């Protein structure tokens, strides 16, 4: 059945994996909502998608702010009449040894990755319950299994996995599936910001010896958002080139 004529709200979708996911969804006939905290990036992405003939809406919002999230959801429903798919993609990382991490590092990492996922899901779920249909896909990370120097990020993403499982149980009888994708090393702006020596070290521990691409994530999200994936819920799908086979 696909996702044609469905409405997808994708957070953090003005760049990287989120943008590629929004593009894949739009190419499959969905109306997409581009969200980011950066208004200029949102505007540029909306213009790009519109020029390709896609149905698109821009929503500038800080997903860690309840009022902003509620406003974004209202904006989406006012424009398209409903929300069928939510992809909680927005995320960020503050890495470092435990002794060097500040309270602010912890707070911002939890706020964006975990609280933002909670607020967005809470804001859309009632609408999905009314429609007796919904696809919610959360982006975790292979890092939820733990990684040195990733205490805030690993904690946040482990929370996302726990939230995914709890909500799959709570919302299943309402026709809503809740799943989680755990990417490994993906070629995104976050990757490009890493020092070359860190990139080489990480790739040396990658079974495939190479990075994944945003389209690898987008295709997995497309599968989970599809109407035909209604019997898949509460799952964590690793898209990591085998990296999850190894600890640390």
From Swiss-Prot:
Keyword Cell membrane belongs to the record: no
Species, as recorded: Thauera aromatica
GO biological process: fatty acid elongation; toluene catabolic process
PROSITE patterns reported for this sequence: ADH_SHORT
Enzyme Commission identifier(s): 1.1.1.429
GO molecular function, one term: oxidoreductase activity, acting on the CH-OH group of donors, NAD or NADP as acceptor
NCBIfam families: PRK07231.1 (NF005559), PRK12826.1-2 (NF009466)
Keywords noted in UniProt: NAD, Oxidoreductase
Assembly mode: Heterotetramer composed of 2 inactive BbsC subunits and 2 active BbsD subunits.
Binding of NAD(+), residues: 15, 36, 62-63, 89, 153, 157
Function: Involved in an anaerobic toluene degradation pathway. Active subunit that catalyzes the oxidation of 2-(alpha-hydroxybenzyl)succinyl-CoA to 2-benzoylsuccinyl-CoA. In vitro, can catalyze the NADH-dependent reduction of the artificial substrates 2,2-dichloroacetophene and 2,4'-dichloroacetophenone.
Family the entry assigns: Belongs to the short-chain dehydrogenases/reductases (SDR) family.
Active site annotation, chain numbering: 153 (proton acceptor)
Name of the protein in question: (2S)-[(R)-hydroxy(phenyl)methyl]succinyl-CoA dehydrogenase subunit BbsD
Inducing or repressing factors: Induced by toluene.
NAD among keywords: yes
InterPro entries for the chain: NAD(P)-bd_dom_sf, Sc_DH/Rdtase_CS, SDR_fam
Catalysed transformations (reactions): (2S)-[(R)-hydroxy(phenyl)methyl]succinyl-CoA + NAD(+) = (S)-2-benzoylsuccinyl-CoA + NADH + H(+)
């Amino acid at each position: 059945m696909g996702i044609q004529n469905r409405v997808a709200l994708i957070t953090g979708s003005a760049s990287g994996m989120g943008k590629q996911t929004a593009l894949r969804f739009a190419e499959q006939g969905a109306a997409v909502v581009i969200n980011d905290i950066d208004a200029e990036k949102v505007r540029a992405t909306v213009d790009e998608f519109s020029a390709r003939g896609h149905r698109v809406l821009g929503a500038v919002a800080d997903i860690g702010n309840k009022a902003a999230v509620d406003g974004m959801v209202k904006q989406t429903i006012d424009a398209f009449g409903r929300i069928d798919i939510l992809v909680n993609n927005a995320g960020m990382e503050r890495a470092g040894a435990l002794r060097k991490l500040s309270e602010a590092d912890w707070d911002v990492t939890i706020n964006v990755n975990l609280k933002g996922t909670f607020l967005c899901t809470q804001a859309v779920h009632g609408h999905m319950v009314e429609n007796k249909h919904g696809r919610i896909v959360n982006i975790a990370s292979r890092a939820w299994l733990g990684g040195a120097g990733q205490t805030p990020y690993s904690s946040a993403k482990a929370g996302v996995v726990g939230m995914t499982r709890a909500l799959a149980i709570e919302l299943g009888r309402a026709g809503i599936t809740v799943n989680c994708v755990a990417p490994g090393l993906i070629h995104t702006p976050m990757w490009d910001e890493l020092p070359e020596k860190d990139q080489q070290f990480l790739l040396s521990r990658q079974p495939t010896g190479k990075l994944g691409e945003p389209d690898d994530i987008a295709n997995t999200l497309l599968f989970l958002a599809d109407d035909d994936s209604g019997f898949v819920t509460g799952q964590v799908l690793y898209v990591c080139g085998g990296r999850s086979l190894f600890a640390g």
